[in-house]
Amino acid sequence: MSDNAPAPKKPARNNGAVVMMCLSFVFGMGAMSYAAVPLYRIFCQVTGYNGTTQRVDQVSSVVLDRTMRVTFDANVAPGLQWDFKPVEREVNPKIGETIQVHFTAENRSNETQRGQAVFNVTPGEAGVYFNKVQCFCFTETDLKPGEKLDMPVVFYIDPEIVKAVESKDIHTVTLSYTFYPKEGPKPLALNEGGAVKSEKKL
């Protein structure tokens, strides 16, 4: 009588289940990557991470007897033929004081261009305390050929900045903007009478 017992049979692999698992993994990773950008943006807005400023609807009710030096930086990414710069290079508002500054943008190309401003604050620890009430960066900007636009920014520094360990010794912050080209339908050109110009078909 042989002592060699027959080897147990391996259960048949369910190929369908394996395929479904692989597909679920692929679709799951795709969904995560798609959601990563908006989730990261929300995270930055809530925490001020990476110098992201805050958008608010109300001004501060507290104004401290201490000033903060705020400098401004303006840049234009390739693809936009714009002259973009701050009117005021720096201001020294009291912490908690609401203040308005201005930037100008001029389209030096021969066509209408659309841009979107991206912003940040340095040092990054100050971002969560830099509150913007009004800003051209909240919307896209269209400029016709040769058009020049005055763009105000209304902001204040949250008084809480002097209480946080990581930010209480900050005395200068820089608000920086970069305009990037934004794709989208361009506004229809108008003739001198204000009517939409019709395109000639060949």
From Swiss-Prot:
One of its GO terms (cellular component) is plasma membrane. It is a single-pass type II membrane protein. It is found in: Cell inner membrane. One of its GO terms (molecular function) is copper ion binding. Keywords: Cell inner membrane, Cell membrane, Copper, Membrane, Signal-anchor, Transmembrane, Transmembrane helix. The chain crosses the membrane at residues 14-36. GO terms for biological process: respiratory chain complex IV assembly. Residues 1-13 are cytoplasmic. InterPro entries: CtaG/Cox11_dom_sf, Cyt_c_oxidase_assmbl_CtaG. Pfam families: CtaG_Cox11. Its main location: membrane. Residues 37-202 are periplasmic. PANTHER family: CYTOCHROME C OXIDASE ASSEMBLY PROTEIN COX11, MITOCHONDRIAL-RELATED, CYTOCHROME C OXIDASE ASSEMBLY PROTEIN COX11-RELATED. Exerts its effect at some terminal stage of cytochrome c oxidase synthesis, probably by being involved in the insertion of the copper B into subunit I. Belongs to the COX11/CtaG family. This is Cytochrome c oxidase assembly protein CtaG.
